[in-house]
Amino acid sequence: MGFGSDLKNSHEAVLKLQDWELRLLETVKKFMALRIKSDKEYASTLQNLCNQVDKESTVQMNYVSNVSKSWLLMIQQTEQLSRIMKTHAEDLNSGPLHRLTMMIKDKQQVKKSFIGVHQQIEAEMIKVTKTELEKLKSSYRQLIKEMNSAKEKYKEALAKGKETEKAKERYDKATMKLHVLHNQYVLALKGAQLHQNQYYDTTLPLLLDSLQKMQEEMIKALKGIFDEYSQITSLVTEEIVNVHKEIQMSVEQIDPSTEYNNFIDVHRTTAAKEQEIEFDTSLLEENENLQANEIMWNNLTAESLQVMLKTLAEELIQTQQMLVNKEEAVLELEKRIEESSKTCEKKSDIVLLLSQKQTLEELKQSVQQLRCTEAKFTAQKELLEQKVQENEGKEPPPVVNYEEDARSVTSMERKERLSKFESIRHSIAGIIRSPKSALGSSTFSDTIPISEKPLAEQDWYHGAIPRIEAQDLLKQQGDFLVRESHGKPGEYVLSVYSDGQRRHFIIQFVDNLYRFEGTGFSNIPQLIDHHYTTKQVITKKSGVVLLNPIPKDKKWVLNHEDVTLGELLGKGNFGEVYKGILKDKTAVAVKTCKEDLPQELKIKFLQEAKILKQYDHPNIVKLIGVCTQRQPIYIIMELVPGGDFLSFLRKKKDEIKLKQLVKFSLDAASGMSYLESKNCIHRDLAARNCLVGENNVLKISDFGMSRQEDGGVYSSSGLKQIPIKWTAPEALNYGRYSSESDVWSFGILLWETFSLGVCPYPGMTNQQATEQVERGYRISAPQHCPEDIFKIMMKCWDYKPENRPKFSELQKELTVIKKKVTQ
C-alpha cells in the first residue's frame, strides 16, 4: 500500500491533502504562539501576585510560627513556578515553534516541487501519447489522399499515353512519402506505448512514492515537535511536581495543636500572686458592735436576712436550671458539629463549621459563668442558712439599748430615734430585697447578669441592619440600639435619638477594651449596661444619655447558627442563593449578601425582607426570617421546589396544558392583587421573578426593587438596571412607577406564559422595542394563545396608565376564563 501503487489517478486528492496539512500546521503554529503568550502572561501574573503580597504578612514575629513559615514557602514556591513557566515559554518559542515554522516552509517547497514535476511528466506524456501521434495521423491521412490522387492521374496518363513517366514519378514520390510516414507513425506509436507504460509503471509511481516519503518524514518531524511541546508544557514535570510537593509538605507541617507552643514559651509569664480579698478591719475601728466576716442577726436584720435567704434560694434554682439548659445546648451543638463534620467532603469545608464552633465556645463560657454564679450563690446561701439556723426559734437581740440613762432624752426624742431606726431597718431590707434595682430588676440578680450575656443575645443588639432602618426605629428621646456597621463589618455603632436628632457613635476598640471616651470595658454589653444604668453621657460634647433600649423584632430574627447551608441553588443580584436546613429540619432558601457590596446595595438587599415581613398570601413567596447578627447577612425564604417560572416554562413546554397556563396567570394576578391592596409596587414583575411551588402554585418573588408607597406611586430618579422590555412607558420616560405600571409588566408576563418562555419583542433590541411601543406597536399574540387572554394583554398595554385594568379586575376575568378552558 502506498501513494505510487494506489494513488496514480488521485492527483486532486493528493493536492487537497497537502493543502489541508498546511492549514493544520498553520493552526498548530498559531496555537503554539498563543500558548507561549499565555504562559508568559501567567508567569508574569504569578510574579506580580508574589510582589504584591503584603510584606508584613510574611514577616516573622518574635516566635516560630509554622503557619507563617508555610505561607512564606508558598510564596517562594509560587515565584519558582513563575520562573519555570517563563523558562518553558521561552523553550517553547525557540524549540517547537521555531522548528514548526521551518517545517511549514519545507512542506510548502515539497508541494511546489511535486506540482512542478507532476506537471512536467504529465505534459511530456500527453505530448508523446497524444499530441505527436495526432499530428502523424493527420499527415498520414493527407498523404493517402495525395497518393491516391497521384495513382489516378498515373492511370489516366497510361490510358491517354501522354506524360506517363512524369505521372509515374509523381505516383512513386507520393507512395514513398506515405510509406516513410507510415514507418514514422509505427515507430512513434511504439514509443508512445512504451512511454505510457513507463509513466504509469515507473515515472508517476516514483514521484508519488517520493512525495509519500517526504510526507512521512515530515510527520516524523511533526511528531518530534509535538513530543517536545508535550514535554515542555507538561504540568507533571519533576520541577513542577517538586514545587507542589514543597508546598504540600509545608502545609502538612502545620499542626494546630503545637502551633502556639513557641509563642507560649516566648511570652510565658509567671503567675501573679492573687490579691487577697479580706474584710477591711479599719471599717470597724469606730464601731464595736460589728464583727469581721460575721453575718449580723438582730432585730434590725432578722427579717431582711430571711428575705435575702429566700431570694438567694430562688436565684440559685433559676441559675441551676439555666445551667442545665446551657449544658444541654452544649451537648446538642457538639453533636450537630460532629454530624456536620462527617459530611465534609473537602478539608476546607471545616470553615463552614467555624461559626458553630465559636458559638460552642461561647456557650461553654456561659456555662462556666453560670457555674461561677452557682458557686457564689451556694456559698452565700450556706452562710445565711448557717446564721439563720443558729438562731432558729430565738428572739433577735436588740442592736441599741433604748433604756433611759442619766443622759436620757425626752420621749419626743426617743420617738424620733425609734422612727429613724425603723427607717434604717426598712431601707436595709429594701436594698437586700432588690440589690439590682438600679438595673430595673426586681430579683437579686439575673440568671446571667445582662452585661455578661453575649452581644448577639442582647435585646438591644440588632445585628447588621442598615443605618436608615435603625433610624426608623428611634422615635423618642433616649431611644437606643446597637448595630454592626454595614460599611465596615466588624465595627459596631450605637444609634441614639437625642434632642430631635438621630446620632450614631462608633464604639471604639482600643487596647482590648470597648469605650466611647470614658471608661473601657472588656465587652460591648458591659459598656452599654454601664452607660444605661449610670446615665453617664456617651460623650461630653454630645450630652447623649441612654434611656430606652429598643428591642429587636424577635419574630423574624434568626441566628446564623440556626441554619445550615447546603447546595448552591444559583446566584442572585446580591450574592449566592443556597438551599438550607433549619434546626427543625425545615428546608429553606437562603439568600446571602456579599460582604464587599456597597452600602446602598446592602440596604436594597434587606429591603426585600422588610417588605415581605408584612405579607402573607399563598401566591407571594414567604419570608422565614433574617440573619443580621453578623456578616454575611442572610434572608431566609421558603424553599419553592419548582424553581423559577421562566426555566419551568422552557423545560416543560411540551407538557404544559392550556388550562395550567391560565391557572399560572390567575395565580400571578391573585398575588399582584394582594400587593395592590397593600400599596406595594413590585417594579420587576416577570417570569424570571416568579417561582413554581408544590402542586404547580405560582408565587411572586424577588422584591429587591419593590417599594411600598401610601400614595401608590413611586418616582425614581434612575435605576442602574431596568428591565426595558417589561417596563411601562411612563416608568421608562419619567421614572413614574405605580400598580398601573405593574399591570403593564403583567401583560408581558402573560405573553411570556403563553409563548412558553420566549423573550418578548423577539428579534428586537431594547431600544428598538422602546421606539416601536412609543409608535403604538404591540407584540402579536403567541401561537395558540386564546383570544380572551390576548385581549387582556392589550388592555394591560394601554399607553395611558389610568385606562389599564386593576389587578382585582384581572383576577376576576382570569377566573372566568379558567372555568371555560377544558383542556
UniProtKB/Swiss-Prot annotation:
Record's comment on post-translational modification? Autophosphorylated.
Output the superkingdom of the source species: Eukaryota
| Region (Important for interaction with membranes containing phosphoinositides) residue spans | 1-300
**Catalytic function, reaction form:** L-tyrosyl-[protein] + ATP = O-phospho-L-tyrosyl-[protein] + ADP + H(+)
Q: Which InterPro entries match?
A: AH/BAR_dom_sf, F_BAR, FCH_dom, Fer_F-BAR, Fes/Fps/Fer_SH2, Kinase-like_dom_sf, Non-receptor_tyrosine_kinases, Prot_kinase_dom
What molecular function terms (GO) are annotated for this protein?
Answer: ATP binding; lipid binding; non-membrane spanning protein tyrosine kinase activity; protein tyrosine kinase activity
Residues binding ATP, per UniProt = L569, G570, K571, G572, N573, F574, G575, E576, V577, K591
- In which compartments does the protein localize? Cytoplasm; Cytoplasm, Cytoskeleton; Cell membrane; Cell projection
- Residue ranges the record marks as coiled coil: 123-185, 301-390
Q: Where does the record place the Protein kinase domain? A: 563-816
Q: Which UniProt keywords apply?
A: ATP-binding, Cell junction, Cell membrane, Cell projection, Coiled coil, Cytoplasm, Cytoskeleton, Kinase, Lipid-binding, Membrane, Nucleotide-binding, Nucleus, Phosphoprotein, Proto-oncogene, SH2 domain, Transferase, Tyrosine-protein kinase
Please state every residue range assigned to the domain named SH2: 460-550
Keyword hit for Transferase? yes
Residues modified as Phosphoserine: S434
Spell out which residues are annotated as carrying Phosphotyrosine: Y402, Y615, Y714
SUPFAM superfamilies, per the entry: BAR/IMD domain-like (SSF103657), Protein kinase-like (PK-like) (SSF56112), SH2 domain (SSF55550)
What does the entry note on its domains?
Answer: The coiled coil domains mediate homooligomerization and are required for location at microtubules.
Q: What is this protein called?
A: Tyrosine-protein kinase Fer
